[in-house]
């Protein structure tokens, strides 16, 4: 039986449960196909895979995200807690086999949702860049399509 026929007969076998992390949003557990086209669609273009963690997981991101001006998303940190890279655009966190991607385990799903839970904004400070977590109320308002609340000007009495 050909691979294409197998995919039609058993489509669930060619899907994986992964974490989708989009700029300005909380991570989401999603089910995605394992084909290159599925991965490219999820990240909005050609894919690049990085392996920044000791766990058997990969980060699939848009290879041209920074070049194309996609929104900065989340920082990756070195062992000393310094920003080592910033991912631009949406990315996927997937489990790994010896030669392919696979679903994250439940423990990995929880661990990486926690690691990437807070959306970040970035500030250049001299030669370094700082990642600042976005407050929950701002994330929630963006999700509802609202602008962040503006603080009213304090009442000042003329003396």
Which residues fall in each region the model found?
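Detector for the mature cores of small, proteolytically processed
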Residues: 8-42, 46-148
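Non-Sec secretion/translocation targeting segments of pathogen effectors
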Residues: 144-159
């Amino acid at each position: 039986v050909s691979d294409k026929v197998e995919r039609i007969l058993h489509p669930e076998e060619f899907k994986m449960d992964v974490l989708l992390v989009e700029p300005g949003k909380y991570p989401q557990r999603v089910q995605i196909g394992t084909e290159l086209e599925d991965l490219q669609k999820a990240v909005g273009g050609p894919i690049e895979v990085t392996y920044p963690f000791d766990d058997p997981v990969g980060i699939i991101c848009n290879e041209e995200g920074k070049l194309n001006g996609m929104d900065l998303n989340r920082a990756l940190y070195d062992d000393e807690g310094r920003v080592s890279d910033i991912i631009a655009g949406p990315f996927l966190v997937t489990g790994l086999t010896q030669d392919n991607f696979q679903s994250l385990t439940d423990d990995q799903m929880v661990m990486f949702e926690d690691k990437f839970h807070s959306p970040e904004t970035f500030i250049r400070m001299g030669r370094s860049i700082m990642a600042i977590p976005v407050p929950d109320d701002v994330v929630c308002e963006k999700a509802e399509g609202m602008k962040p609340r503006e603080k009213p000007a304090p009442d000042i009495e003329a003396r």
